[in-house]
Amino acid sequence: MKKALLLLNMGGANSLDDVEIFLTNMFNDPYILGIKNKFLRKFVAFMITKGRLKTAKHNYEQIGGKSPLCELTAKLCEKISSLKSEFDAVDFAMNYTSPFVKDVLKKYEKFDEIVLLPLYPHHSQTTITSSLADFKKAKEELKLKAKISLCEPFYDDDTYNKIIISHIREAIKDTDISDVSLIFSAHSLPRKIIEKGDIYEKHINEHVQILSKMLKEQGLNFKDVSLAYQSRLGPVKWLEPSLNEALAKCENKKALIYPLSFCIDNSETIFELVIEYAKLAKELSFSFYKVVECPNFSDEFASFILEKSKNAREFSL
């Protein structure tokens, strides 16, 4: 019996030429841009992409011309593959840029089971639901007969949260944190998506509560711990408070940022948080501003993913 573990994620531009592909595919996703008429959605996606392309390319140029997401995920797969497991293959696929799901699945047409693990700690229709819909379409087009199993969101998993605490501890070693504010920065969503029943905000709030308790239990006593949202786009109402607002209200001018929505570093961590918000912190006269790295391909995260995969349940697409 041949078995594969497939990690799912959104994707990120692998080159400057990929930026337009990424934006077009993302904004044409009905789970992102909720316009039912596909022709109208395609037109709106084209207009948004056209308006953002120049700025987006400039942003990518500042981080080496590409997102680190695919490279880091490939290293995570290699790390997992080096561990003893029941899997004959460990791979990854993306929604909006290569490697696309359909292309990856072609390698596993003769496999008996594929275990899906979306690399999103929290559930949202814009992430997990979208990834699974993409997978379902590819599976049907390829007429794949393999059994499909799915791993659930893991924001409340004790092992995962211990990894987060460990990364936070490493980031502030030799630092007096009694006057440092810890801000958990989550990717924002339009408020209307939450109002339609998306449970993302609920998961985020629960996650912050869990981590806040663990921090106290481990003696990591920051001045305060709070939640803020990043990556707002357009004039609609988004989840609040924004990270801009949180930094502006930070009277002690010292902040440690943890990117709560991500397991793997990407343009929204290494550009938006590390570069853009660092500039804002400097303008606000911060004396300490630091962003914690995501778990990425660390040994403990690779081991966690492998252990988590054992709890996958058969899933009907």
From Swiss-Prot:
Reactions this protein catalyses: heme b + 2 H(+) = protoporphyrin IX + Fe(2+)
One term under GO cellular component: cytoplasm
EC main group: lyase
Keywords: Cytoplasm, Heme biosynthesis, Iron, Lyase, Metal-binding, Porphyrin biosynthesis
Major location category of this protein: cytoplasm
Matches recorded under InterPro entries: Ferrochelatase, Ferrochelatase_AS, Ferrochelatase_C, Ferrochelatase_N
Pfam families: Ferrochelatase
Compartment(s): Cytoplasm
Enzyme nomenclature, EC number: 4.98.1.1
Residues bound to Fe cation: H187, E268
Family, similarity comment: Belongs to the ferrochelatase family.
Function comment: Catalyzes the ferrous insertion into protoporphyrin IX.
Protein's name according to its UniProt entry: Ferrochelatase
